[in-house]
Amino acid sequence: MRNRTLADLDRVVALGGGHGLGRVLSSLSSLGSRLTGIVTTTDNGGSTGRIRRSEGGIAWGDMRNCLNQLITEPSVASAMFEYRFGGNGELSGHNLGNLMLKALDHLSVRPLEAINLIRNLLKVDTHLIPMSEHPVDLMAIDDQGHEVYGEVNIDQLTTPIQELLLTPNVPATREAVHAINEADLIIIGPGSFYTSLMPILLLKEIAQALRRTPAPMVYIGNLGRELSLPAANLKLESKLAIMEQYVGKKVIDAVIVGPKVDVSAVKERIVIQEVLEASDIPYRHDRQLLHNALEKALQALG
């Protein structure tokens, strides 16, 4: 029997936020509705942060970023969704996509309904699910025991992080848990370690689903050095250990990293190490190279 390929899988689930998750989803967009992204919703900076401070609700920025990268048919709707206001007025810096998602959130019973309305408008087949449909922020405790609230402040820390929490304690979106339960393959990364990847793993229902699933899990490492000093100073094996500490079980079966990463301390996991950089932006993954690396990981997993 031949080894499985990505095209053979019925359900692929990717976890993360920011540009990284969007890159993974766009590299696998040929899977269509068999692909699901579970998106971090703790951002409190930029346009997203301004909307949250004035209107409340979940953070829409990472969701918008994923939708932007999944648009394959340019249209008036997609141009509107990607538009960012300039100038010095009250709308300066706001992304229209964030405002559209927030408006649809007001008009919908659930944030997930707002996302599905936008997906249909933009002709995006990939399922996108917020990690939680409740407003939530990230909190860190630094090495001095100080509480640091919000992604923006956590990104500015210069000392090690001792603990991460979500505040308040919120439930995961039930469809996200179901997607993990049904998955044939789970992917996490790339992305900002503490502020894009870890928030999803802090949800107890997500952690429980990851402990229980028989699906293999692949971690994709960043290509560039993180701007956050606590994250930038972590070695690959430390990141894997921290993720699994919060999940409560050894769950990562394979890692995909660039050629410069030290993998000598990574034991009992499949390592796919090769050139992955996009030609235009070296710290971003090339979509085809990433797709090929995921195929190799799947083949090695058997």
Swiss-Prot record:
It comes from Escherichia coli (strain K12). One of its GO terms (molecular function) is LPPG:FO 2-phospho-L-lactate transferase activity. It comes from the Bacteria. One of its GO terms (biological process) is regulation of cell shape. The lineage of its organism: Bacteria, Pseudomonadati, Pseudomonadota, Gammaproteobacteria, Enterobacterales. It is found in: Cytoplasm. The gene is ybhK. InterPro entries: CofD, CofD-like_dom_sf, Gluconeogen_factor. This is Putative gluconeogenesis factor. Was shown to partially rescue a mgfK mutant in B.subtilis, suggesting that the function of this protein is conserved in different bacteria. The keyword Nuclease does not apply. Keywords: Cytoplasm. Required for morphogenesis under gluconeogenic growth conditions. The keyword Cytoplasm applies. Belongs to the gluconeogenesis factor family. GO terms for cellular component: cytoplasm.
